[in-house]
Structure formats: C-alpha cells, structure tokens
C-alpha cells in the first residue's frame, strides 16, 4: 500500500488473502496517467523485460459479438468486451541458448533486430563464461560502416543486460573506442541491477569483462583473416582505418593488432590494402 504520509513511499502489511500470489498496486500521479495506457506498458515491458525467464501477461480486451434477432448478421457489441490474457514478452533470450541449438539464420535475424541493419553480419562470436565471473556475450562484426561512424560524439557500445533484464544501450565501457563498430550484447549474472554508467567506469568486474571481450574480438578477426580472407578484406575496407587507432591506444594487444593490419604494396601494382606485415616479411 502507498504510504499517504510520504510522497513516493510505500507501506507493507500482512492480510488474509483467498488466492495465492502477490499483488503490487501502483498509484500514479495525475500527470503520469500515460503509464496506464496499454501501448506505454507494452513498450516498457518489451524494452526492459523482453528476455527474462518468466512470461509477463497483460489483459487484452476483445469486443464481444452478438447475433441480431431474425438475422444471420453478426454484430460487434460496443458496450461489452471480453478480456483475455496475452503474453507480452518473448520470455526467451537467444544468447542463453546452446550454440548448437541456434541456426545461422537465427543469429543473423537477431543481429538485424539489434543493429537495425538490413545486411547480414560478416561474423559473430557467442560465448558463455563461468567461473569467478558469469556472463554471456554475443558480438557481431557488421558488413558495412554506418554513415556516422566517425562522429565521436555519438554514443556507442554494447547492450547491457543483467540476469536477462535490459539495463542500458551503448555501454561503451565493455570495449575500447577502436572497436566501436562491434554490435552485440553482454549479459552479466554478477553486476547489480541498479548499476549506473558512472559505476561501470570504476568497476573491476567490468574491467575484466572488457579485457576478455577485446581479446575475443581480435582473435575472431584473426581467425576470419586466416579462414575467410575475402571476408576479412571486406571488413578491412569498412573498418580498417578505425582498427589502426588501436595500435596507438592498446599496447596490451599490440601483437594481435599488428597481425590484423593491412597495407598497399607496389608488388601487387594496385592501391588496395591487402598485404599483411607477415606477407612483407615472407617475401
């Protein structure tokens, strides 16, 4: 129950209840009536709780029908309606499923929904970590650069979930700036639900996840360059200039970054950046 003596407060009391379960009753201020609107509630649920384990149901009013006397016409009654329960959220999260149970087209469809992109990603990396820390990451490499990639004021980062509850967009603390083209999610089981961007900047768990995710992206790109060189060439043409920023910023991963660099060469007699440092040394 709301505590009438404290604005925004509440009270808890024990009552005799015929049915099992807990009821939470919210009292809204007059100027906040929009939160009673069906579309507003559904929007909040799908944004923040679309992937939690339990289904969230809302009543959906459907107009009732009646048959007019001496007529075969079915009419919709304007005065009465029947309420049915409808599940609003998905109650599943793609990244929580075992990789062997996820189809390639499912990964691609999730990326398009996540990144608002019509093209399939070049590659992705899906990992679940258990041990001192427990978290799941699903990271994508886009096929092309967005038009505002060089806008340094635009916030970029991963979507952060904690125990499948959406916390924030553009959590930039989980990857360095030179990997700002990466799209994806990180879902932690250890971070507090009330975490803020300020706390993310000074959190040892976040630093550890950032280090692991950075290395994972660079290793995925290394594997892509080795196994699918034509795909890596496509990546380099889109994001190579940004990846070069890492050479000056990230000394810890300098060796990995050096292997990913590509340059032009008079040996090939064209202006394309396709030659690695290893290629130069091998000649």
Segments (PLM) and residue ranges:
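Conserved GHKL (Bergerat-fold) ATPase module
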Residues: 1-283
């Amino acid at each position: 129950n709301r505590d009438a003596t404290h604005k925004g407060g509440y009270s808890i009391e024990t009552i005799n209840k015929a049915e099992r379960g807990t009821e939470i009753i919210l009292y809204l201020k007059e100027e906040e009536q929009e939160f009673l609107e069906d579309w507003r509630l559904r929007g909040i649920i799908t944004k923040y709780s679309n992937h939690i384990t339990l289904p969230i149901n809302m009543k959906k009013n459907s107009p009732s029908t009646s048959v007019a006397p001496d007529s075969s016409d079915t009419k919709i009654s304007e005065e009465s309606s029947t309420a049915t329960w409808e599940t609003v959220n998905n109650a599943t999260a793609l990244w929580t499923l075992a990789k062997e149970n996820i189809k390639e087209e499912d990964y691609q469809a999730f990326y398009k929904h996540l990144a608002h992109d019509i093209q399939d990603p070049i590659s992705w990396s899906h990992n679940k970590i258990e041990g001192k820390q427990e978290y799941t990451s699903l990271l994508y490499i886009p096929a092309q650069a967005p038009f505002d990639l060089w806008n340094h004021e635009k916030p970029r980062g991963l979507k952060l979930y904690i125990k499948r509850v959406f916390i924030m967009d553009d959590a930039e603390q989980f990857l360095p700036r030179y990997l700002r083209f990466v799209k994806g999610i990180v879902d932690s089981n250890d971070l507090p639900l009330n975490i803020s961007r300020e706390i993310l900047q000074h959190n040892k768990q976040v630093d550890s996840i950032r280090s692991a995710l950075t290395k994972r992206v660079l290793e995925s790109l290394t594997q892509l360059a080795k196994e699918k060189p034509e795909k890596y060439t496509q990546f380099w043409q889109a994001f190579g200039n940004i990846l070069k920023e890492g050479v000056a910023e990230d000394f810890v991963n300098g060796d990995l970054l050096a292997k990913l660099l590509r340059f032009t060469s008079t040996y090939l007699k064209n202006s394309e950046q396709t030659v690695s440092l290893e290629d130069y040394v091998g000649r």
